């Protein structure tokens, strides 16, 4: 008897529920697609491409729509002899400067054995190398910069590339930039010259509502799961949870996928609403754990100080209670402590991530107003993460509780 056999009850093609799956059609984004197509039309006409800026929360279709439309654009422009279209797609998640973006663009355009070092060049020299590569390719070149908000305020490249031809750096290439951002504030913080250049065309992707998410799930389920594995109530619940929380198709698909995994693990043939609730809880726990692990060193120190107070049953706690512990733990870990106000910012970050609950108290003229903090997640979850903080000298009351 085989140890492993194929799934014949839940998943027909589970890859269709994964983040990297690209559907053949796009659901519930008709207006955005129409606007996007109009912005791309000059390319079909053989004209200089427009620069396009897409923004909206994670999971609302920005990248999926871009991949879908640009694939169609490449196919449809093949029939025109005077249009030579090239695409270069760069995810900027781990890039924090124009210099790093330029280096990575050069290395995407060059053969693997001819790539440049990520350090050691003046920025203008890297830009010049990039222009040489673009001119060597020639024709219309769309540079898609996904997660572009990660470069922060160092946005010079977002002006340099669109203006390279008019400034005499390019003669054979007609570049256009498509910037994709999850951060609503990124556009507002761009320098005026970059804003005027990059935001030539702006497209806002709003969160999905429950009916839209339901339509997306129904379309995916047709190929991803067996007919009897999931019913309308389960799909509607996944859509409703995601719509009320983030409006993200990615979240709705993740909940459905995790629900299927739970059912499969339990040896059950159908998904139930109970599976959906379990899936939501598991995904939220995973997200919280990831958020805690990704904190800065001082975020970790603030987390440990709060955990000590919680174990000693001293929460909810004010900043005046947390700061002395934070300072002691930092000094014991050979880390220079922040001033109280900056440390308070890290508590606020923990609250924003849903790790801490924050409540404002107002005691009138005598006591003033202040915040109190306590954990919004289980201390066992926090302890599992803190246990891996090797560079922090944990207080005895914390160390004994989590070992």
Curated annotation (Swiss-Prot):
Pfam short name (any one): Cdc6_lid
Keyword Transport (UniProt): no
Keyword vocabulary terms for this entry: ATP-binding, DNA replication, Nucleotide-binding
Binding-site residues, ATP: 60-64, 208, 220
GO BP annotations, alphabetical order: DNA replication
GO MF term (any one): ATP binding
Gene3D superfamilies listed in its UniProt record: 1.10.8.60, P-loop containing nucleotide triphosphate hydrolases (3.40.50.300), Winged helix-like DNA-binding domain superfamily/Winged helix DNA-binding domain (1.10.10.10)
InterPro entries: AAA+_ATPase, AAA_22, Cdc6_C, Cdc6_lid, ORC1/CDC6, Orc1/Cdc6_arc, P-loop_NTPase, WH-like_DNA-bd_sf
Secreted keyword on record: no
Alphabetical list of SMART domains matching this protein: AAA, Cdc6_C
Function: Involved in regulation of DNA replication.
Similarity annotation: Belongs to the CDC6/cdc18 family.
PANTHER family: CELL DIVISION CONTROL PROTEIN 6-RELATED, ORC1-TYPE DNA REPLICATION PROTEIN
UniProt-recorded name of the protein: ORC1-type DNA replication protein 7
